[in-house]
Amino acid sequence: MPAEAMARGIARWSRRVGRGLVGSRGGASATPVVPTTELPAAGFRDAGTFAGGWSARPALGAAFRHASTAATPPVFDGATCERVDVELGTARTRTAVGFETGRVARLANGAVVASMGDTVAMCAATTARQPDPEASFFPLSVDYRERASAYGKIPATFTRREGPPKDREVLAMRVVDRALRPLFPKGFKNETSVQVVVLASDQSQDPAVLAVNGASAALAVSDIPWDGPAGAARVAVDDAGAIVANPSDADCEASRFVLTYAGTEDRTLMVEAVAMKPGGVPEATVAAALAAAHEAAREMIDPQRRLAAAAGKEKRDVCDAREETTAAAVRDAVLALARGRLDALYAEEIQSKSARGKKMADLKDAVFAELAEALATARDAEEAPPTAGPPGASVSSQTVSDAIAKVRAAAGADADDAAIRKAMKHHLDGAYLHACSRVMRDRVFATGTRVDGRGLDEIRPLAAAATVLPVTHGSSLFERGNTQTLATATIGSLNDVQRLDAPVGPDNKRLMLHYAFPSFSIDETPRRGGLSRREIGHGALAEKSLAAALPCSDAWPFAVRLNAETTESNGSSSMAAVCAGSMALMDAGVPIPEHVGAISIGLVTEEDEATGAVTRHALLADIMGLEDVLGDMDFKIAGTRSGITGIQLDCKPAGIPLAILVEALETAKRARGRVIDAMEAAIPRARRADLGEVSEHSPRFHAMDIEASLIGKLIGTGGKTIKEIQSSTGATISVDQPIVGGPVGAAGAGRVGIFAPNKKALDLAVERVGAIATPLAVGAIVEAVVIDVKPFGWILRTPGLDEGMLHVTEYHWDAARIETSDFLPLGSTVAVKVTENGPGGTKFSRKQTSEPPEGYAPPPSRTSGGGLPRPRAPLGRGAGQSAGRGLGGRAGAGGGFVRNPDGTLKRPLERVKEKSASRE
């Protein structure tokens, strides 16, 4: 049935349903039904009731939109559906946001369906009933998936199901994790899962922002201990410097800077930002964007609080009281045993990661052994452990004694030493890290020096080199302390761009940075499995930081793949990938205007125990791995000398004050300048192909205009011509559509892009395409190939694929001198002159490529009663000709045209008379 007829039928049926009648085919009777709401064009999903007993339950699509269009939420099994709706943003970007709980996923600890415009995400949070005694950190897992149906597609997989998480989904998981994790209370070790499923997308809002808000709301209404809620927002900075809150995807693509933010009422939890144009944005602009994003995120918190107040569950206890007592006692004991020796170890200012790590591991074993000995000696709370320790150790006997007494009391009077050791075991690693962190912070605040002896603003020793590998298009090695990255750049054509299948964002990307973190870089044995989420996340951050530096595709029509191999790691390996990648791009001849450097800024703080306010803080430039583990923040900042191109914030406490982040931007700017100095010393600017500076293996590109009427000739039937050129030269050729009003031809011009693996291939391809793109001029002398032999001459093809006729009379000035040896076989090449090129076709002349011989007399014209004889087919594959036959003669005659006894050519009329006489 045609689509129009089907649509008309559905419309007629809908009108009858709306009037309350559905007539039979014959029209003899009608069945009354309950009138329904008007059916939408897409189908029946919003119909309240349907003939035949459909339930009156409203469709999810209607209920998940804002309250003005949703039906009254029904009650299921005594549970009430609660919903909170708000409108956020400015007049231009105003968006309806809703949070609903109680309709779906009611068995989860907490579940919320969040909506922003027509983007809908289902978020659920669950947790284990008991804590994991083996967990050394909080076991939180986040899963984020985008259903293909959310944006009206069927998956292109073989099974037509969604496959493993895409990179975009993995990055969204990391965003949600980093926004939620800092707000879980210390000591909570129950395995917890947060799952987000995007059910619908209007393809204008980033679902990751909605996922953070929805997951926060799900935790807020659950019984899971959590110090939220948290709000998330996205802001964009346009070319005029104006900041737009909750921008659409189109707004983001046209902006200079896009920032995704999550925070609480007064602190920042997570930041991700990227510059969209070369050069980045100044620190002042980033600070303003952070402030605007914080205000936009705060607007998301109040609706969640209202929802939790209406439908939230009572929070469970963080942990058992005995566990909490044991953990605190073990921390006190380990700190008392380790403080003095850690102070002495840090004072050594060991530069090597491996040497420092070995000493810290030995110290840890010694402390644990002493604690076990103290436990074995102290049989009851009154018995004190030995106070003697190794030389240099400072041990508080009373603290250790009190700690063991608390552990014994928490374990119970009947607990033996084995039970007590088991109770303490799960807290030892955390207690030792706490001691290391406490001593490190005291050293920073007291002396202004760090574990390896550096000052707070001092960065580790730098080393940089370019062109470290042969054959590759570009390569570099960047080293900062014990962090080292080897990068390679490979340039490809625009056919090599990565196609993206995402509801929002660009359709493809020209720069692909693949970050690798092998186990040997941290002296560990290999792990099983594919890419980790960490590798995907670090690679994406480095890629976004460098992507803005690439010229536009019109100025530099290439795709680039960067491989960043982490060969050593002691912190900030993703920032080393940015630095090494920038150098590799310049080494490959990618015309980026300036280097992109990167640095990580750490933080140590002291807080007021009563209020939680930060009383002291210190920023650490270029943090190493130990400072990342023991500190409070990892603030990764990439950019040029003039601005910031990429940002990512991870934090451990329940957020960082915004003022500290703004201060960190200036610290990073100073440190980044020193990093770029080292990079410029290795390679100050991008290498230039026109100066012969790039590798001989580097690809080349050339663009030329082509007349619109010649595009078909270049492509050929079924692409035959362009494929043959690509096959013979090794180049890749792309043809853009004609530009109306272009400089070539009245009908406009097309653009031909030629990408070749090296200069030789490029020159050959340019010559071939140039011959086709240049119209054949009358009077030009060209080399042509014989492609067919006719009775009257030869069909030739020029390098520009123009075909024309070389008549036999145009072969030689003196037709009488045409000999058998002069015949042109198929495939032979001949130099000819273009005598005609127009609507009537193209004609060539061989004889006009040279001057006529002395004494040459042109043959009489046909108008004077003469005329040239009609020649027969030359040797070759002419119709009806056999091998060995001469031009115009019999087989074996060895002559040219038919002649009189005196050698003159017989005229056609004379030959006809002779043949007639012979027949008589």
Report each predicted region and the residues it spans.
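Long, basic N-terminal domains or extensions that often function
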Residues: A70-C319
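N-terminal mitochondrial targeting presequence
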Residues: M1-D77
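Long, charged amphipathic helices and adjacent flexible linkers at domain junctions
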Residues: A311, V318-R322, R674-D705, D763-E783
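Single-stranded RNA-binding regions, centering on S1/OB-family and related RNA-binding modules
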Residues: H697-P699, I706-E920
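Mobile "lid/hinge" segments at catalytic clefts and subdomain interfaces of large enzymes
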Residues: D223-Q351, L585-G692
